[in-house]
Amino acid sequence: MSTRIALLALALFAAVAQAQKSPLPVYKVDPFWPKMPLPNKWIIQGVPTMVTDKDDHIWVLNRPRDINPDENGAATKPPRTDCCIAAPAVLEFDTAGNLLKSWGGPGYTDGWPAQGIARPGAAAEHNIMVDREGNVWISGSSQGDSIQKFTADGKLLWDFGHRAARPPAARLPENNQQTEVFPGGIFFFDLDEDAREIYIVDAKRVLVYDYDGKFKRGWGGHGIPLSEIDNNPTPPYDTSGNPPDQIQFAPALHCVHFSVDGLVYVCERGSNRVQVFTKQGKFVSSFFVHPSTPSRGPECGGPGSQLYGMCGTIYNLTFSHDADEKYVFLADGTNDKIWIHDRKTGALAGSIGDNGRMAGQFHWIDAIAIDSRGNLYTGEVDTGKRVQKFILTNGDGKLRPRPHE
């Protein structure tokens, strides 16, 4: 009996120790981050992505073209009102909320996203990454866009190319077998710096290029080869029963990230699903995020989406800052939440926030990032137009930079 009791006590101790090792993160919003007002009467617009660098600086990709006429009165000559002017496209903040650098925007370079396109929203700046050397990489999601690499101060270093013709040229039809151009621009990419590779999600596939822009490999949903990906429109998403059992990716693929154990996580927004692969494209696992949410709506990102968002649940993700990255945080711009899932099992563990305009709430959350102390940063598009900071309240105080940064 005493042996059984001892074994039971040991098992309970191990369970408690494991729970204490990676407790569910608890956050509180910092309503005073970033520090306001910004200089020059600047105002932040839609924020599709943000990233933290090796110094825990937060790089925000802002969409100046999203500004409304009643917001930019100070930009006219003479000024109509005291405020405001759209902030530049690239904003660097420290963890205290101080603005450190700012640059970029429409016309900044010949290859800047959505060059010559005036309309706001989807046809604009879309992704930002910062490498270990401090270089800033930016892509856009309009016809003819690509990736450009800059110094931290905004000097153009390199252009990825692989551009389709810009409007008014007709947009090329979907072709998941060709790897030369990106007809709809480049929504999202990530950098494997050790291998010097660029991972791009596009249409129904993941494509990998080297740092010279040469294609290396690619795959579709569940790791199928590019040759087996269909080029047909994706069927409607059915929320009446279980999640759809679909092998192919369902656009939009809205992010790609690497975990600490070298796996590739793909945000399949069209199926409310995360698919996980090895870096060679072998399928590992998948899990759904609030699968009853409508997705694949034709008006996603368009005029009707203000009335009924049909974009799905997975806009972006980041991983918890514990050594094993036990949790994955998923930004859901349709339900306006951050879902917390167990990274390895895919099980739902909790959530942060809800719909609203107050601090700690969201309207169309699109961007999410984490620093080495486990604090979260978020950005919102549509009329949300802001960034927020959420402070980890139950961390161990250890600094853990992202392994690939």
Residue ranges of each PLM-predicted region?
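Positively charged n-region of N-terminal signal peptides that target proteins for export
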Residues: 1-5
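Bacterial N-terminal signal peptides
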Residues: 6-15
